Regions:
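Acyl-donor binding region in acyl/amide transferases
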Residues: 83-164, 283-361
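Generic, well-ordered alpha-helical scaffold segments in large soluble proteins
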Residues: 21, 25, 109, 113, ...
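Alpha-helical subdomain
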Residues: 48, 75-79, 312, 357-360, ...
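Acyltransferase donor/substrate-recognition loop-hinge adjacent to the catalytic core
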Residues: 3-4, 150-228
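An acidic- and aromatic-residue-enriched active-site/binding cleft used to recognize and process polar
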Residues: 75-79, 94-96, 127-129, 179, ...
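Generic start-of-chain signal for non-secretory N-termini
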Residues: 1-31
Length: 377
């Protein structure tokens, strides 16, 4: 068998090969949500992605006989390393054929990159920030993928463990059958806490709301997630990008906020959207020239049965007060009106008992589990 060559991505051709490999590897999978090519071009471009202000990154391809058989990004998040007082090199966007030799070569390259920068540990899959896909799927390979998460074949965890990697943390994903009505317990708790803490709940209404509350939403996210594994705060520039690129495309009825009634201060938020997986499959991960039609169709015209609960963030001083009941009492009627039958919760750290426990009263089923692996250098 021919030797495996590791090639650093240095130009547009190499970047195209890096992005294309994921699509080629999973094009026959009925479960994978294709990466959005335009998003990947932005994410891996140092001139565009604000994360490069505090991250170092190199991308590599594994080739055999001139054919791409694997890919990986080596990332050092200096901000996260400083915050957590660690020296970690991350590996992200890793894909490879069912061959441990290919994976070994790719990860050895990441390890070499890390050592050259004084790192002491390798961890992944992780992106630049928590808003990038993270965690290798270890359970739920026959469950529909969710946009913005990683899908991989079942040989990935076997090969990682074969190469000496161990568990760092796990994330769990839960699926909930949509209630036909607001549970009585949620109603009671929602009424109680809204009166006790003088809170109001509503959805965003228009572009003016997006401009006003967008930065505040990301401020709440930074506060709520600050103690979670590997988290580094979103900068104002990063938040501005997500606000301008993504919030306008979401039905604002599905962007929910809780405010203090007397001050108007934001204390919690929940963001959701229809599942985009089937739309992405039909669009083959391309927004242009015609892929956006499939996306708009799923967003507004022919919604799928699944709504993706992308995030819930509660200001630390209001956590453990049952604000989830207030959020769900507002959102469940909206979901029912839109025809959703199931809700899928985006990955949550298994150790985040507050977050995972939010859904207990709705009889959730853990349908997928993913893992961050680690190894000393």
């Amino acid at each position: 068998m021919s030797a495996i060559e590791i090639v650093k991505v240095t130009d547009k051709k190499g970047l195209k090969q890096f992005i294309d490999f994921n699509h080629q590897l999973y094009k026959k999978s009925p479960y994978a949500a294709p990466e959005i090519r335009e998003d990947m071009l932005y994410t891996l471009d140092p001139k565009q992605n604000e994360a490069f202000e505090f991250c170092d990154c190199e991308c590599y391809l594994a080739k055999r006989d001139g054919k791409v058989v694997g890919r990986v990004a080596a990332i050092i998040n200096r901000k996260a390393n400083q915050k957590w007082d660690v020296k970690v090199v991350r590996f992200g966007w890793i894909d490879f054929i069912d061959d441990a030799k290919v994976a070994r070569k790719l990860l050895e390259q990441v390890e070499a990159f890390g050592r050259a920068h004084g790192m002491e540990k390798i961890q992944g899959p992780l992106g630049f920030t928590d808003f990038d896909p993270e965690g290798t799927l270890i359970e739920g390979f026959d469950e529909l993928d969710t946009m913005g998460t990683l899908y991989n074949y079942d040989y990935y965890p076997r090969i990682f463990e074969q190469l000496g990697f161990e568990k760092a943390v796990d994330w769990v994903e839960q699926i909930i059958k949509m209630p036909t009505h607001i549970p009585e317990k949620h109603k009671r708790v929602a009424e109680l806490i809204s009166k006790r803490y003088n809170l109001t709940v509503r959805s965003l209404r228009n572009k003016k709301d997006v401009q006003e509350f967008g930065p505040k939403i990301f401020g709440i996210i930074n506060q709520a997630y600050s103690k979670l594994f590997g988290y580094s705060e979103m900068s104002a520039r990063q938040a501005a990008h997500y606000i301008s690129e993504y919030l306008p495309s979401i039905d604002l009825n599905m962007v929910c906020i809780i405010q203090e009634a007397d001050t108007g201060e934001l204390v919690a938020t929940a963001i959701s959207m229809p599942s985009m997986t089937r739309a992405l499959q039909r669009a083959h991960g391309r927004l242009f020239p015609l892929g956006w039609i499939h996306m708009l169709d799923a967003l507004h015209w022919h919604r799928p049965e699944i709504v993706d609960l992308m995030l819930i963030a509660v200001r630390p001083d209001h956590q453990n007060r049952g604000l989830n009941a207030l959020l769900f009492s507002h959102l469940i009627p909206i979901y029912q009106q839109m025809g959703f039958k199931y809700a899928v919760v985006y990955p949550q750290l298994e150790t985040n008992s507050r977050g995972v426990g939010l859904w207990d009263d709705l009889s959730p089923r853990t349908h997928r589990r993913r893992r961050c692996y680690t190894k000393p250098l």
